[in-house]
């Protein structure tokens, strides 16, 4: 059995060598483990030679740095004194997906310079939900309201003589514009009727900005078709309509498929959407026939060959379990 003195001697001999080997091992691996970062260099690593920088995967260190970046809410572009103002008229009404629809639309409009959002609620008063949402966006907006009388509202029957949803709200916006701007106003502007459930390309707003009288373009997912569009001849003039539903309408076009010069709206003070005696699909014609003829229309979107707006609709949420056993708090705004 080894003596205690012998064990101590072995420990004193082995311990220094163990420490030396450990230090040497760490110093030899350090260059391989270290992340080099030169002063003044971009914290993101450059892609290897020949690699597509858009497909190059950054290191874990870079990903962590991106996650730590604080979110900054985007505000609209600076106002320009040279660009015409686009007045976007949006009727809206209370429903479970209203805030989601308006939020999505606001996120699009935030990228459009010189834009004024005219939001008109179908309600007896302006609702706090819509008021807060508009205020928080930072957009240039006007918040109006007018309630459609119950006996005017559609009941889902195409033969029902009641007016289509949004008619009174769009008319209130037209009245507001005429009361705000004098009839002989020289301020350049364009009026566009944009529902809150559609999807809009940013290119669409730049296309309509140069509207002299009334500009037109295709709209996707309407009339039971992939898209409806004005029919344009070789001379760049609108001569008809590519649609199945009643193609002989004066203006067989969807509400999202045209924009009107502000001066024309101000000068033709009698032009409104008709409340009575208008068949389904004729609301657009009831306004446009008071403003222009077919020959006056200006085809946009590459002579009406590009799709820049989609008549999308959010699926109605199934809330069959709502209110059972107090599972959710009804005071939480959605």
UniProtKB/Swiss-Prot annotation:
Keywords: Endoplasmic reticulum, Glycoprotein, Golgi apparatus, Manganese, Membrane, Metal-binding, Phosphoprotein, Secreted, Signal-anchor, Transferase, Transmembrane, Transmembrane helix. The record marks 228, 321 as: Interaction with galactose moiety of substrate glycoprotein. The active site is at residue 284. GO terms for molecular function: galactosylgalactosylxylosylprotein 3-beta-glucuronosyltransferase activity; metal ion binding. Pathway: Protein modification; protein glycosylation. Belongs to the glycosyltransferase 43 family. Involved in the biosynthesis of L2/HNK-1 carbohydrate epitope on glycoproteins. Can also play a role in glycosaminoglycan biosynthesis. Substrates include asialo-orosomucoid (ASOR), asialo-fetuin, and asialo-neural cell adhesion molecule. Requires sphingomyelin for activity: stearoyl-sphingomyelin was the most effective, followed by palmitoyl-sphingomyelin and lignoceroyl-sphingomyelin. Activity was demonstrated only for sphingomyelin with a saturated fatty acid and not for that with an unsaturated fatty acid, regardless of the length of the acyl group. This is Galactosylgalactosylxylosylprotein 3-beta-glucuronosyltransferase 1. The gene is B3gat1.
